[in-house]
């Protein structure tokens, strides 16, 4: 096991516009090839799109973002466990950090899968839908929950 450097929670700087560490981590997840400024531009433009759509409502883009992340977070997932030569899909609780990571991944995956529009528009739309409990990321979460529900019989194998 390596004893190398690991980035800690405290070292993550909040993003410059909204002063939010969760958003900063989301930007890092969106980033490709170390191009952080491009990722920031995409997220901030997506937030501008959201603000345009909200128009008269009292919610802000950052509120929509937080609500979307909260809605997409899974509570349970299935993990493979080998017992006596057979692999079982065992439902398990998801740890808080993994919940957040999965939510980020699913939202970005949903936004990237829809082609034909600029990324900031796709991301803005996906965040809006997720905040209303709709969209592809929510479908992924529901599918994960259904899978866990279907394999409830193997819950006693949890470690």
Model-predicted segments: where are they?
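Strongly charged
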Residues: 2-33, 37, 45-159
